[in-house]
Regions:
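Accessory alpha-helical DNA-binding modules that contact the DNA backbone or grooves
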Residues: 1-141, 162-163, 183-197, 210-212, ...
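Charged catalytic cores and adjacent phosphate/nucleic-acid-binding surfaces used
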Residues: 101-263, 273-293, 298, 302-331, ...
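Active-site catalytic microenvironments in core metabolic enzymes, especially phosphate/sugar-handling
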Residues: 335-338
Length: 464
């Protein structure tokens, strides 16, 4: 039924409920529990029924899972392609958290500039992949797509499109700060444009529209602010002084420092699926100058120290041979992603560490340690001289698992003093280090690495 079935015992229970009460849906289960039917079954009782009701209640309170950014981008791209087929569409853009490139996205919002909103709306609601039309108005409409994904459309006059685009891109906090700046200038901002408010101000009360966001920000004495920066994290103050940071683009990226090949060192976690040679060819295609192969460490439970060392020597030889045959091409660093054990140790002997150019360490177990204990654990692993990178540092999995608790100022101070690097993991299900902590790391002057955590050659395309 989708609520709380996570063990073999849960599966047996669900099977009995289906068989004996004919339950086929979440609604059926709730009705059966509320009416007392479950407690009357042999082996259940009142306590079991109450437990099921509590699980259902907890499930109902849980917020719906948000869409991972790459999936939301794909859905939006398909809708935008469809909209562009209509001759009345002058311009089309995503809105909200999708346009700001947030790690997860709720409903997918899209805006269109057009002089014929009726024609655009009619075309939008005829989207062939829609499950149903949720709402259809004169300038707005909503569709439900398979997977219960909602797509909302707004159509604006091209003369005022820039104002609408700016307003509905957000974020909320960015817009509040922008509104405060405008008020100090005697202006009022909205999704329709900017209105003079101060007594005696030229054109008082007459709204000024903007075709583009660039014109909108310029009117407020500001440089254009890219959507990715609109979080009220200093961009409002930096923009008028021409001090906005330059965004990193794909063409700027010269390396991927977390890749898992299928070179078998009998790893503790999942092995990659593509050969080193295949990965090197893809890296060359992407224009990279260097990459790192970072297979998981050999399983400590299945190998003694000598076996681990021998496996790592074997990999060292393979990397050296590939570098020799790859002269004047992509350089390969021999690395490893090593588990940080609960007490802070690492399961690779020093003789094995000596085979590496550098190592990554990461958390794959015991996620709920108290903050002080977890911080001590991480710093202990980072103290090894061969360890340079803390990989997917919060250990979060979007929509699945919250991140670990760490004393980040203490972590960052350690990094600063010991010249360690911290990873931005580009796997769509992680996007870790989160953006807020990236900005903090930069303030400390800490070096950041980028890694796709690819376990297949196609995963190298996840660099974001």
């Amino acid at each position: 039924c989708g609520a709380g079935i996570s063990t073999a015992e849960d599966v047996k229970t669900a099977f009995r409920l289906v068989k004996e009460l004919g339950i086929e849906s979440y609604t059926d289960l709730r009705k059966a529990a509320a009416s007392g039917k479950i407690s009357k079954l042999e082996g259940f009782g009142v306590d079991s029924e109450a437990s099921i009701l509590k699980s259902l209640s907890d499930f109902e309170k849980k917020p719906p899972a948000r869409n991972l950014l790459p999936y939301a981008m794909e859905v939006a791209a398909n809708i935008i392609t469809w909209l562009k087929k209509n001759k009345d569409v002058v311009k089309v853009d995503p809105l909200g958290s999708l346009r700001r490139q947030a790690s997860t996205v709720g409903d997918i919002d899209i805006s269109v500039a057009s002089n014929n909103p009726e024609g655009v709306i009619k075309h939008f609601v005829s989207y062939p992949n829609a499950s149903r039309v949720l709402e259809k108005g004169q300038r707005t409409a909503s569709l439900i797509l398979p997977g219960n994904i909602q797509v909302d459309l707004m159509v604006a006059d091209p003369k005022g499109y820039g104002s609408l685009l700016q307003h509905f891109t957000g974020s909320k906090h960015h817009n509040i700060a922008l509104r405060e700046r405008a008020l100090k200038m005697g202006l009022s901002v909205s999704d329709y444009g900017i209105t003079p408010r101060r007594q005696g101000f030229a054109g008082q009360g007459k709204i000024k529209q903007f075709k583009t966001e660039e014109e909108f920000y310029r009117y407020l004495g500001m440089d254009y602010i890219p959507p990715e920066l609109r979080e009220d994290s200093g961009e409002i103050e930096a923009s008028p002084n021409h001090k906005l940071p330059k965004l990193v683009e794909l063409k700027d990226i010269k390396a991927d420092l977390q890749i898992h090949s299928n070179f078998d060192i009998e790893t503790s976690h999942d092995l990659g699926q593509s050969s080193m040679k295949e990965v090197c060819e893809k890296a060359k295609e992407l224009g990279y100058e260097y990459i790192a192969f970072t297979e998981h460490n050999p399983s400590k439970s299945k190998h003694g120290e000598k076996q681990i060392i021998d496996l790592l020597k074997k990999k060292r030889q393979a990397v050296d041979q590939l570098n020799y045959s790859n002269k004047n091409s992509v350089h390969i660093f021999n690395s490893l992603e090593i588990d940080i054990l609960p007490e802070g140790g690492i399961p690779v002997p020093d003789a094995g560490m000596d085979t590496l150019d550098f190592a990554l360490v990461s958390i794959h177990s015991s996620f709920r340690l108290p903050r002080a204990e977890m911080t001590k654990r991480v710093l202990s692993a980072l103290s090894h001289p061969k360890v340079k990178v803390f990989a997917h540092p919060t250990a979060r999995k979007l929509n699945e698992r919250e991140g670990i608790e760490l004393n980040w100022p203490e972590i960052f101070e350690f990094y600063k003093k010991n010249n360690k690097w911290i990873e931005i993991n580009c796997d769509p299900g992680r996007l870790d280090l989160p953006d807020v902590l990236v900005k903090e790391a930069i303030k400390y002057g800490i070096k950041l690495t980028l890694g796709t955590d690819a376990h297949h050659v196609d995963g190298l395309n996840n660099m974001m």
